[in-house]
């Protein structure tokens, strides 16, 4: 295998998201979408599948030594994620938004080596926003260097999260308890956009001060997690401990706000 730089991997990811952008926008504007249900409210479209297939074919043809961990190609929740160079792909994060022509959704591509994210490329086609990062190389939005916010107090902060797919009584009670804990501490605003990857990207450029969620997958947060750390933020477990991307939970943001939020958020109870 030739000596491939992180910048070369990144450029390949950028090229492929820009290549498929027009097709995504065309399908986004169409009122006729082929929709399947992975669960009661969890959607997948023909566009999700076509985008992932194109990304996989393009990147593995150019880099045959790389593996794939993709949302639509991963079955039964088994993460085939080892030490080999692995592309972690979410073809459309925010599929429900995409289906309803709500403009917040994105394509997310990360490269993991030894299970560490070293390349991040996240593209929001409607907004034409391209977030990029390499390990140790900083984070960028449309080529301009970005950083997380410097807000110190919760009363001045915007917190972002999502309601997720758990609509059981216990799941709703857990969600509302955390909302109450946060709002009681007088955060300035609480936001829900329906796309974890884009919300975390918004953290990386300082639009949002912190994001948390339970129920996410590695492909939802892989690229955005590198954006945040390269922009000076932290990505942790909601308790404040080390983040495990396979644990399906995350808290991230500027260190001041993350530290305060970790003391307010309760842990989700395990299902019986």
From Swiss-Prot:
Q: Name one GO cellular component term.
A: cytoplasm
| Pathways per UniProt | Polyol metabolism; myo-inositol biosynthesis; myo-inositol from D-glucose 6-phosphate: step 2/2
Report the enzyme's class at the first EC level.
hydrolase
Keyword Cytoplasm in record: yes
**Regulation of its activity:** Inhibited by Li(+), Ca(2+) and Mn(2+), but also by Mg(2+) at concentrations above 3 mM.
Gene3D superfamilies from the UniProt entry:
3.40.190.80, Fructose-1,6-Bisphosphatase, subunit A, domain 1
- Keywords of the record: Cytoplasm, Hydrolase, Lithium, Magnesium, Metal-binding
Taxonomic superkingdom: Eukaryota
- This enzyme's EC code(s): 3.1.3.25, 3.1.3.94
Compartments annotated for it: namely: Cytoplasm
Q: Which family does it belong to?
A: Belongs to the inositol monophosphatase superfamily.
The name this protein carries in UniProt is: Inositol monophosphatase
